[in-house]
Amino acid sequence: MKKKSVWALALAAMLMWVGKPAVAAVNEAFDPVEYVNPLMGTQSSFELSTGNTYPAIARPWGMNFWTPQTGKMGDGWQYVYTANKIRGFKQTHQPSPWINDYGQFAIMPVVGKPEFDQDKRASWFSHKGEIAKAYYYKVYLAEHDVVTELMPTDRAAMFRFTFPENEHSYIVVDALDKGSYIKVIPEENKIIGYSTKNSGGVPDNFKNYFVIEFDKPFTYEATFADASLKEGTKEQTSDHVGAVIGFKTKKGEIVHAKVASSFISFDQAAINMKELGNDNFDTLVQKGKDVWNEHLSKIEVEGGDLDQYRTFYSCFYRSLLFPRKFYEINAQGEVVHYSPYNGEVLPGYMFTDTGFWDTFRSLFPFLNLMFPSVNKEMQEGLINTYKESGFFPEWASPGHRGCMVGNNSASILVDAYMKGVKVDDLETLYKGLIHGTENVHPTVSSTGRLGHEYYNKLGYVPYDVKINENAARTLEYAYNDWCIWQIAKQLGRPKKELDLYARRALNYKNLYDKETKLMRGKNENGEFMAPFSPLKWGDAFTEGNSWHYSWSVFHDPQGLIDLMGGKDSFVMMLDSVFAVPPLFDDSYYGGVIHEIREMTVMNMGNYAHGNQPIQHMIYLYNYAGQPWKAQYWLRQVMDRMYTPGPDGYCGDEDNGQTSAWYVFSALGFYPVAPGTTQYVLGAPLFKKATIHFENGNNLVINAPNNSDKNIYIESMTFNGKNYTKNYLDHNDLFKGGVIDFKMGDKPNMNRGINPEDMPYSFSVNEEGINKLSPISVKPSKKKK
């Protein structure tokens, strides 16, 4: 099919998808944003996640997102596809329903009565009357006969309300609870206020200041406080406040609202309003579309079907949302930020709303590959976080949050450094990394290293010292120590220091149980915990079981292969993940958590792609000389576990991680070990992909005979030369060139099988490492 007809078909189908009739005119230019479905993954619930996403109407990495709100105030599931009522249109900063929101407020048009209550003002809607795009949202509110449209910039937005003929048309502004302020300024057609609502991770002086300007004079003003609406009042400060302003409207009359906000001040919010300029609504919509197309056009894929295009660009879109900008541009044009760590307004970048336990795996490597200049700003923001709080973040929203395990800020920082994204203050970076290995945050135990005293002395976090998820912590700390070793080597640190982190990087060996060939929690006395079930979720592990976590040796798969008795045994254990039925032990949680249910319903054995610990596992076949098995299972995952619809994911999307996995895998490679410059090969999904790098170079990936049957790599060339390695190097890709794949329906069992074809492993590729041993102590004798 010609490319032109593909785009025409895509646009027509997308317009029907969002409930708008297809139009005859088609933009012949490359228009990838029209493939994006912001509703992908929104058909989720507490019991079962198909993404746990909401339609984020935003700019890439925007400080504010906007979303229609179907859930009640404070509900983490703020938009659910199965809902049939909208309560408002919310400025949101929520990265996950489990983390929830902060600084949010909502706007809602109503007709007839000035209803402020979120249930009474709610309106029925239909997805047939809804258009959701990355840069624009439109919906018909049947209860009020009002069409609401919105478009965002980074820190501002514009609404366009189309009202019916009515003498009692209103707009509600809800500053939500937990302490808020509102003021109506009718002589300026303006409302100002602030929201202090949050879910943690903020200083005492936290506020989100907002300014709303209307283009129609008010005929009605009221404010809400203390559960009552007070007509004629213009200002309120209380736990939960808001405002209602009204107009007389003609049929089809349009009212615009300009909105901007700031975490710094009302004055800064007014400065942020300038992002809208003097453009009208339609011009701003087009500018937003252009911004998204500029970013999404960095990768052009061809030779797939419509669902694959939709899925790819929807995942690409999700990969460009988090971490969000938490900085602003002041009146002098300087980059400044309100610190969510110490409450001060300080110079420099700040980003937030991401959990590194999830996103170190592929989201940040994707940014290093495709948007290194943006990630440079993010890295500077991490340095600022350390300066302002004494720790690098592990889960930030907006400040430190108590969630998940690991010290994976080390991976984020080191992977960027190794791929040429280098901060100016390397001394502070290294100092912060070392500090994190020897300390834990005094109030947020997931920041720094909980159990570092045991880990640094024994070589593992014991099972029986009342530190949960101890085996998971040990495995991740070992990988994190390898990351630190990588940058210490680059910085020329002393040999004694290098050897310390090299030995700690081998600490994963301390948890390997040769009887089960799996990782297992270990008691302080050096004996393995008992009884042991590889199917038990949680306990020694994090949101998974031993079958999932035993592969968390990102930096040294060959070391794990050696522990398991060689490549054949290793492959047998990989195979077992798919062969074992989706059995589980949920006794640690006292019930089935959603991650367990997501594994069982996907019918792929004990492979749990809906959560992060195992997402790299399939690529490990490459290290054992059987890359064709990776090629098979990767296509299975892409075909069976991703769709472009509301049930599009097989678990939590998690701030770009599960989406970036798909984008990488569809291109044919994946960063198994962030901190190296290598990407491990899978097999491409499309017949052609063209990557446009920031440095101006282009990489073309050709697989002309790719199909749903031709999923195996028969042969491969890179810039015309035969290529047998099971990995690609970042620096080689960045130079641009052409990769040609010849695909077939049968595996080539003679390609990628030699030692020189294997990807990086710490114990093989680094001199002298095989002579080192992990930190360890001998088991103490049992008392009689």
Residue map of PLM features:
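ATP-dependent phospho-/nucleotidyl transfer catalytic cores
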Residues: 480
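Extracellular attachment/recognition segments
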Residues: 712
